[in-house]
């Protein structure tokens, strides 16, 4: 009885028709490929309940100067500090303005004022989009820096669990986010309500924001038609992404302090948390593709599942898209709301070392990688923090991989398959189904 090898390359191919994925994996969930071997992802266990039934939309982990470990997590109405012993402390500033748990889209009828325009004449496209409230979190030394896109104020928390986070003195308000540069400047993004403005504090002093001959504070309005979405540290630079393009900020010293250069067009960010930095550069999701920046110019990242992802995403809830790294497996995960959901219930994963993709379903709203803590910590839709890559318990989720069609020979021979010899790392029972 002859054996016919089915050499299926790692990763999922989900572009085009089923037939175009011949000889490839067509669908999967909770499956990864590592060094050519297919296996389930690691399991997860509950770590802490951060906020009952409130979605975390921003998180960070860090160690303070005494080597104590912390996490911070923000919802649309609260900001929390989480100790290494999983004690959750509400550090919400007293002046914080509650935001929006979900995005809202108002278009067409009711989007304008009664009596505007003349009957039968064309109108401009009327779309009012309110984003879901998300948090931009970073550290200033051992202290937490936080800003929500709805509230717009910049806060600092100095590790005192008996005190709330406080507004940073003299910092601009009505901001869209923050990032702390490698040179220790605090950038306010969309500063003062100007969606294209970057304003920075003096070096090592986040309370000095007015430029003077004796400091390095400053500001600049980006030459772009878009609005700033996020800032993220890149190697030797700070990358600023708008919803249309990308700009790199490079420290130059006085008198200009920072120089800004557009490094990519038509590569805007889909959301304020869609970018992740790894050794190979910064990767992010756009509205119809994926991009990377490792110095020089932005590069497109070819994606073998882009048709599936972007035809399946909820455009109205795109502001909830977020990226999480899993460095142990050289992965970047993007969680997104599917077209049938208001919450992040699906994901797409890129293995940036082996250059392949995976897809699946899993509801997570934010997360931090391992490093500060032993395991990645990802947050579920009910406000629970989970230790991931821990054991083999995948709850009630279904783990599977489905291939595209196979042709034996030229497809002109009828064969009867009586046995399949798998080559994969198995955790428990595995069932196989043939489709004809």
Language-model features, listed with the residues they occupy:
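Hydrophobic or amphipathic alpha-helical targeting/insertion segments
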Residues: 139-167
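Short beta-strand motif characteristic of blades in beta-propeller domains
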Residues: 72-73, 146-147, 186-189, 237-242, ...
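Asp-box/WD-like beta-propeller blade repeats and closely related beta-sheet repeat scaffolds
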Residues: 130, 158-181
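Surface-exposed extracellular loop regions of Gram-negative outer-membrane beta-barrel proteins
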Residues: 238-264
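Carboxylate/His-rich catalytic cores and anion/metal-binding grooves
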Residues: 173-208
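Structural signal for beta-propeller blades
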Residues: 79-80, 152-154, 195, 246-247, ...
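Beta-sheet repeat architectures centered on beta-propellers
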Residues: 1-96, 105-142, 265-281, 287-436
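Beta-strand initiation motifs
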Residues: 87-90, 161-166, 207-214, 254-260, ...
